[in-house]
A protein has these predicted regions:
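Alpha-helical adaptor scaffolds
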Residues: 16, 21-94, 98-101
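Solenoid-repeat scaffolds in large eukaryotic assemblies
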Residues: 4-8, 41, 78, 111
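Contiguous, function-dense segments enriched for cysteine-driven chemistry
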Residues: 54, 108-110
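Terminal, low-structured helical/coil segments at or just beyond the last alpha-helical repeat
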Residues: 110-137
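Inward-facing hydrophobic residues that define packing positions of alpha-helical scaffold repeats
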Residues: 5-8, 12, 45, 82-83, ...
Length: 137
C-alpha cells in the first residue's frame, strides 16, 4: 500500500496541475473509501482540488470530499467543502448533500431550503430524491 501511495505521489508530481493528477487522486480516494480509510481519502481529495484547473473536476472532488467529511462527522467542514462546488451541473447534488448534513446538525429549516433548491435545479431523479427527503422532514 505504501509503495502504491509513493507511485501516486510521484505521478502527481510529474503531472502537476493536470487533469491526469486529479484523476489518479480521485481514484486513490475511491480506494481509500472502499477500505473505509476516510482520513486518507480526505487527504487525496484535498490534493485533487489543489491540483485541479477545471471547475467540473474541482466540483466533483469537492462533492466527494464533503461526503467523506460528512461520513467522519465533520459537518461544518463538509458544508464548507460544498462551497467549492462551482459547476452548475452539480448544484442539485450539492443541495441534496447539504440538506443531509444540515439534518445531521439538527438544522431542519436549512435542510428544507436545500432540498427545495435541489427540486428547482435537479434532473427528474434528483427532484424525486429531494421530494422524498422533504416528505421525511
Amino acid at each position: 500500500a505504501a509503495e502504491q501511495q509513493a507511485k501516486v505521489a510521484e505521478f502527481v508530481k510529474a503531472h502537476d496541475k493536470t487533469s491526469y493528477a486529479v484523476f489518479i487522486l480521485l481514484d486513490e480516494a475511491k480506494g481509500f473509501v472502499a477500505k473505509q480509510d476516510y482520513a486518507s481519502a480526505e487527504n487525496s481529495l484535498k490534493q485533487a482540488i489543489a491540483q485541479s484547473q477545471d471547475d467540473i473536476l474541482t466540483s466533483l472532488a469537492a462533492l466527494r470530499l464533503s461526503a467523506v467529511q460528512f461520513q467522519q462527522g465533520q459537518f461544518d467542514a463538509a458544508l464548507a467543502s460544498l462551497n467549492q462546488v462551482k459547476s452548475q451541473g452539480f448544484s442539485a447534488r450539492k443541495d441534496l448533500l447539504a440538506g443531509d448534513i444540515q439534518i445531521a446538525k439538527g438544522d431542519v429549516n436549512g435542510a428544507k431550503a436545500s432540498f427545495e433548491n435541489a427540486q428547482k435545479s435537479g434532473n427528474p431523479l434528483e427532484k424525486q430524491m429531494a421530494q422524498m427527503k422533504l416528505n421525511n422532514l
